[in-house]
């Protein structure tokens, strides 16, 4: 699973194969005063579970963001672009403009003994991003995809760790199918 580590600078260093791409972060993406430098590294970890449909949850485990929350938080699209770029390294030349976010759900991890910051600013959260990728070279006929992104932030050490992967939306149990609404 690709993971991004950070230390205190203001560029995103996205390493894809032998290509290195720098992206200037904006205040829309990061909170004021917290400037981070992401360095891509491979990290092997078990895949995040997708045992139930995070977009149709009646247990309260997941929080589905509304349209304005997605539009007001540009970092959600950045997370999606980073996961797609690192998951499909051979097809990055096709660009990432063909991505369209449909829905976003989040789950806040609650580890015993660890203080929890709630809401979109949660220090330890998993984001489930339902999206369409119209790049056939990258995904073939399965344009409906889900990106799972785990964010762990240590504000004391100013370290941000992102890990994630993409999969077909058909991996959700058939009994809990998502509706294809978008904005």
From Swiss-Prot:
It comes from Arabidopsis thaliana (Mouse-ear cress). InterPro entries: MS5. This is UPF0725 protein At4g11700. Belongs to the UPF0725 (EMB2204) family. It comes from the Eukaryota.
